[in-house]
């Protein structure tokens, strides 16, 4: 008799996606981050739902409602800090996931890669709007500065900003719509994840060697379900350490001051996971230029498949490209550090140099080095 999981219409989909899915026998722990991102998304949706039950999206009560959650709601502080620090873990996994795709040439699966970029942009938009909701000083001024960048768009810029604000400044209308979008976007992200997986299962997995996975495949369960479960446990450890011992380590002290439109904080900066893009934005003195640089810093991922000159898909056997990849990682670390520093020398100069290096590495240096490697390996 055929197992019910293979014939039941609903269970069959689950079975083909997570149980009998043919997976390469040699994918390493770097492939764990997809499932960790799924776990992070589930955590964010659940904790966010409970927070939404007690939060009020009104400028007069938003800040006090967050305080009420932390002080008066049973385990409200755990839910709140799981949500804020869960976002940090989400982005950490996202960056590693994208980095793994770059290192092992997963961008050759173009549909999966492009949906991934859309997912990255959607998650960034969701996180930005979520940061505005507690209505602290950094929430208010972060929203003002970032939304105001749209005024650099010719002709329609000013109208667009006022349309997003719902008035002539960041106010009640802005907070209400940001809460509405912050609530609905994770559900859209979940739908996009399904599309991401659909395309991935159409083409099959990449693997560390960058060769065809077809000759040797194993079922996803129990091998990779067990491996993913270990990954989830290892992710829970640092997350719970942050939540229970250092809940405000990654936050900004200014956000514990209620929003005040008449008092600008000395250093306006976003959460740590946006600092690299913020540093690139700040390194250009022209307003339209900085908006284009900010967008390009993410959308540059979309043209990476077009810049691929290497004859080998993976960087596994390309030591020069490996060195450049880690230079790129170090450059992103530098940009993240610079984004959190005040706008003064030498930070401005370092930020500009790191921004130029970031674009040069991806657009010029890495494709050229790949061509040199082709010659060296006599491809």
UniProtKB/Swiss-Prot annotation:
Membrane topology: Multi-pass membrane protein
InterPro entries listed in its UniProt record: Cyt_b/b6_C, Cyt_b/b6_C_sf, Cyt_b/b6_N, Cytb/b6-like_sf, Cytochrome_b, Cytochrome_b_C_euk/bac, Cytochrome_b_N_euk/bac, Di-haem_cyt_TM
Record flagged with keyword Mitochondrion: yes
GO biological processes: mitochondrial electron transport, ubiquinol to cytochrome c
Pfam families assigned to the protein according to its UniProt record, in alphabetical order: Cytochrom_B_C (PF00032), Cytochrome_B (PF00033)
Cofactor note text: Binds 2 heme b groups non-covalently.
Keywords of this entry: Electron transport, Heme, Iron, Membrane, Metal-binding, Mitochondrion, Mitochondrion inner membrane, Respiratory chain, Transmembrane, Transmembrane helix, Transport, Ubiquinone
Gene Ontology molecular-function annotations: metal ion binding; ubiquinol-cytochrome-c reductase activity
Gene3D superfamilies associated with the record: Cytochrome Bc1 Complex, Chain C
Residue stretches spanning the membrane: 33-53, 77-98, 113-133, 178-198, 226-246, 288-308, 320-340, 347-367
Cellular component terms (Gene Ontology): mitochondrial inner membrane; respiratory chain complex III
Protein residues bound to a ubiquinone: 201
Residues bound to heme b b562: 83, 182
Cofactor(s), names only, from the UniProt record: heme b
SUPFAM superfamilies, per database record: a domain/subunit of cytochrome bc1 complex (Ubiquinol-cytochrome c reductase), Transmembrane di-heme cytochromes
Binding, heme b b566: 97, 196
Domain of life the protein comes from: Eukaryota
Misc: Heme 1 (or BL or b562) is low-potential and absorbs at about 562 nm, and heme 2 (or BH or b566) is high-potential and absorbs at about 566 nm.
Role noted for this protein: Component of the ubiquinol-cytochrome c reductase complex (complex III or cytochrome b-c1 complex) that is part of the mitochondrial respiratory chain. The b-c1 complex mediates electron transfer from ubiquinol to cytochrome c. Contributes to the generation of a proton gradient across the mitochondrial membrane that is then used for ATP synthesis.
Quaternary structure and interacting proteins, as annotated: The cytochrome bc1 complex contains 11 subunits: 3 respiratory subunits (MT-CYB, CYC1 and UQCRFS1), 2 core proteins (UQCRC1 and UQCRC2) and 6 low-molecular weight proteins (UQCRH/QCR6, UQCRB/QCR7, UQCRQ/QCR8, UQCR10/QCR9, UQCR11/QCR10 and a cleavage product of UQCRFS1). This cytochrome bc1 complex then forms a dimer.
PANTHER family in the record: CYTOCHROME B
Similarity annotation: Belongs to the cytochrome b family.
Protein's name according to its UniProt entry: Cytochrome b
Naturally occurring in which organism (per UniProt): Avahi laniger
Gene name of the encoded protein: MT-CYB
């Amino acid at each position: 008799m055929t197992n019910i999981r293979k014939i039941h219409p609903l269970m069959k989909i689950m079975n083909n996606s997570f149980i009998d899915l043919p997976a390469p026998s040699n994918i390493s722990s770097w492939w764990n981050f997809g499932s960790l991102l799924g776990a992070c998304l589930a955590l964010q949706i659940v904790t966010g739902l409970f927070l939404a039950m007690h939060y009020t999206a009104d400028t007069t009560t938003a800040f006090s409602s967050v305080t009420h959650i932390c002080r008066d709601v049973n385990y409200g502080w755990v839910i709140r800090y799981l949500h804020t620090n869960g976002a940090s873990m989400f982005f950490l996994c996202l960056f590693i996931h994208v980095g793994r795709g770059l290192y092992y040439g997963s961008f050759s699966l173009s549909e999966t890669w492009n949906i991934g970029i859309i997912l990255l942009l959607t998650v960034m938009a969701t996180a930005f709007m979520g940061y505005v909701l507690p209505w602290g000083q950094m929430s208010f001024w972060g929203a003002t500065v970032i939304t105001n960048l749209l005024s650099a768009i010719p002709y329609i810029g000013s109208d667009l900003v006022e349309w997003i604000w719902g008035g002539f400044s960041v106010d009640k209308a802005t907070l209400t719509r940001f809460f509405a979008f912050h609530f609905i976007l994770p559900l859209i992200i979940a739908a996009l994840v399904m599309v991401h997986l659909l395309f991935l299962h159409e083409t099959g997995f990449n693997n560390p060697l960058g060769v065809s996975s077809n000759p040797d495949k194993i079922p996803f369960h129990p091998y990779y379900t067990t491996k993913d479960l270990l990954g989830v446990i290892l992710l829970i450890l640092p997350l719970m350490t942050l939540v229970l011992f250092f809940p405000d380590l990654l936050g900004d002290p200014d956000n514990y001051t209620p929003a005040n439109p008449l008092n600008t904080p000395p250093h306006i900066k976003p959460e740590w996971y946006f600092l690299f893009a913020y540093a690139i934005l700040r390194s250009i003195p022209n307003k339209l230029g900085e908006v284009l640089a900010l967008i390009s810093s993410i959308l540059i991922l979309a043209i990476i498949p077009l810049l691929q000159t290497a004859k080998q898909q993976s960087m596994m056997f390309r030591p020069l490209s490996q060195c450049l990849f880690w230079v790129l990682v170090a450059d992103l670390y530098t940009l993240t550090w610079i984004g959190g520093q005040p706008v003064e020398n030498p930070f401005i100069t370092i930020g500009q140099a790191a921004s130029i290096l970031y674009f040069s590495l991806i657009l010029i240096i890495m494709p050229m080095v790949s061509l040199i490697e082709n010659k060296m390996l006599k491809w």
